[in-house]
Amino acid sequence: MSKFLSQAALNTLRNTRLGSRQLVRSFAGIASTRNHREPAHQEPGCGQALGRGLLQMRLPVAGRRSMFIQTQDTPNPDSLKFLPGVDVLGKGNTYDFPNGTTAHSSPLAKLLFRVEGVKGVFFGADFVTISKQEGAEWSLIKPEVFAVIMDFFASGLPVLHDAQPNADTEILEDDDETVMMIKELLDTRIRPTVQEDGGDIVFMGYEAGVVKLKMQGSCSSCPSSIVTLKNGVQNMLQFYIPEVESVEQVFDEADRMIDSEFERFEKNLKTLKQQEPSGAGPH
């Protein structure tokens, strides 16, 4: 997830003001991805031509004869990005489901959490990011996720019951100039890059020179998320906004409590399963 900005890059950005999105992305150094391939399902040369694995299923989706699902690695080894080739939430929209109890607003998220080993689900404009539990195998999870996504989009059901656009970077009447500039940079320059890695970054507040941000999707548990904040996001914000002294990652306490309860529940289930073979027979 690391995104580094050199001094030369910053000088170029200064000369071009905010510059183009492509320019900023190139300076941010989008993390390279390793290809996931599904040899049994590919036409010869498809993976090489597209730079990532393709799975083709003969299933009618939105008037199409076939649905192509691409899988793309993220900088987080426990998160994988699925691109169904159709809009998921539409341009600029994201929605995070850090655990199963938060999936009540999405029929698709509910189905994905039923797949054994799935820990988190994240929806982007045209992708779904799946985060797996530690120790779970992608070779077992991927086929089930493929099936769920294809069946769901074939059904024509809405992804969300009440789809709402991101509001954290919406300019409010009481926002001062510094906050407005922070929101603008996050929304137009930083978030698009983070979303390409299968996650998102949410503005949680600004106080006394400190910008508070929340990482979502593949970024939430990525080992290099702190490096991303300090060497990428913080550098860019400080360059354009001198008032910014530092960037801090914040966590949702409610999510932490739910995650803790889930981990405890899973440990209890594993303990029970391990005890079953040595347990007493039927009475």
Curated annotation (Swiss-Prot):
Binding site for [4Fe-4S] cluster: 219, 222
Region (NifU): 182-250
Superkingdom in the source lineage: Eukaryota
Record-linked Gene3D superfamilies: Fe-S cluster assembly (FSCA) (3.30.300.130), Scaffold protein Nfu/NifU, N-terminal domain (3.30.1370.70)
SUPFAM superfamilies: Fe-S cluster assembly (FSCA) domain-like, Hypothetical protein SAV1430
An individual GO BP term: iron-sulfur cluster assembly
GO function term, MF aspect, one: iron-sulfur cluster binding
One GO cellular component term noted in the UniProt record for this chain: mitochondrion
Entry keyword annotation includes Metal-binding: yes
Name of this chain's protein: NFU1 iron-sulfur cluster scaffold homolog, mitochondrial
Organism: Drosophila erecta
